[in-house]
Amino acid sequence: MFAVVALGDMSEIELKVYHNVVKAREARALRDEVQRGIQTYGLVLVPKYGYIYAYEVDGFGHAILTDDANIPSLLAAPYFGYTMPNDRYYENTRRFLLSQDNPSFYQGHVARGIGSYHTPEHYIWPLALIVEGMTATSGAEKQDVLGQLLASDPGDHLLHESFNPDNPQQFTRRSFGWPNALFSEFVITQFEGDPGIPMGDTSDLEFRSE
């Protein structure tokens, strides 16, 4: 999916910046080929959900139905411009990914969300939580995600790679700038000017560059 978007951007750059019609056409043709492949082989019919996008297919009829907590991901498809949040296949995929039917979805007392095979089992990733919020279509879901992210703070006012949703004091990678940067984008783009954000007093926040 990300390749489809990137190749479309590449085609536009080749045409408008470098005025290279041939390269623009090649990039566009490859984009269209990848898109046809996704729509032909990447959609899998799943009971309860309908057709959803598979995380991986092998060309022989087998599919892995899950998602990765990083970006790009299936959940992040509207965020990076592949589709719209109200696309029916994306909506079906999203419902599956944010359910117990997704083997990488975990739920605890503090938060629930998508984890990764790269981190301990049952740990969820703030990155995936933020993407859930940024692709949500309702204010209530955005607020819910924001509340979970704030509740995941172990006391250092930072988001980490992953955390135990039953005990945020247990986390991986103390210094991990990516989710903190994306969290800023989430708040600015989704909540700017909203007086209902439960941000509390931020006067004691520490900003470090390491």
Q: Predicted regions: what is each one?
A:
Residues 7-10:
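The core hydrophobic/aromatic register in alpha-helical repeat solenoids, strongest
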Residues 1-5, 16-128:
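Extended ligand-binding clefts on enzyme/binding-domain cores
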Residues 13, 41, 45, 152-156:
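A short secondary-structure junction motif
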